């Protein structure tokens, strides 16, 4: 994502985050700050590309899919890893393989950047998402993700 892409990224991600029932069920635990939080996040990626990036898939009609990558260091691998977050394909384009192409291209790009693993969290009540990622080579882990908000811009 570059500066001119911010408005398209904002539209795509705000639609996803405001409608995804699985995200909404956990949004309070995430410390969701709504549209201001999303806007701040997009500009953080522009200002600090070392933290991660927003990956967008385009077709003739514009943005068809989007995802967010955040970098981390794995102490078990002793290497750079990536957290895949907020993956979405436009509602009227789902089922066309855009998500698969998006993730495969993302894996190629991250490999070039020496990223050794991609982690993704899937909501327990979303077996379709789990099956999607497993088809793309992701393996289930015997753990559950927890969140603890320690500070927001409001407090």
Regions found by a protein language model. Name each.
Residues 3, 10-43:
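Conserved GNAT-fold acetyl-CoA-binding loop/helix
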Residues 42-56, 83:
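A short helix-loop-beta-strand connector motif used in the catalytic cores of GNAT acetyltransferases and
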Residues 52-67, 90:
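Conserved beta-hairpin
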Residues 69-76:
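A conserved beta-strand-loop-helix scaffold within acyl/acetyltransferase catalytic domains
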Residues 89, 95-108, 131-135:
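Conserved acetyl-CoA-binding loop-helix of GNAT-fold acetyltransferases
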Residues 94, 120-129, 147, 151-152:
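Conserved beta-strand-loop-alpha-helix junction that forms the acyl-donor binding cleft
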Residues 103, 110-121:
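Conserved GNAT acetyl-CoA-binding A-motif
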Residues 134-143:
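Conserved acetyl-CoA-binding loop of GNAT-fold acetyltransferases
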């Amino acid at each position: 994502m570059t500066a001119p892409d911010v408005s398209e990224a904002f539209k795509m991600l705000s639609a996803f985050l405001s409608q995804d029932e699985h995200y909404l069920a956990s949004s309070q635990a995430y410390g969701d700050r709504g549209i201001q939080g999303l806007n701040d996040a997009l500009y953080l990626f522009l200002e600090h590309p070392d933290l991660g990036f927003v990956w967008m898939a385009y077709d003739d009609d514009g943005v068809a899919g989007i995802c967010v990558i955040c970098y981390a260091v794995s102490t078990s691998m002793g290497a750079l890893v990536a957290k895949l977050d907020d993956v979405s394909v436009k509602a009227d384009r789902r089922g066309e393989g855009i998500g698969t192409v998006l993730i495969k291209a993302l894996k190629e790009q991250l490999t070039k950047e020496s990223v050794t693993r991609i982690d993704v969290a899937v909501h327990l009540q979303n077996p379709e998402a789990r099956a999607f990622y497993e088809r793309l080579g992701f393996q289930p882990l015997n753990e559950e993700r927890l969140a603890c908000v320690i500070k927001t811009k409001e407090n």
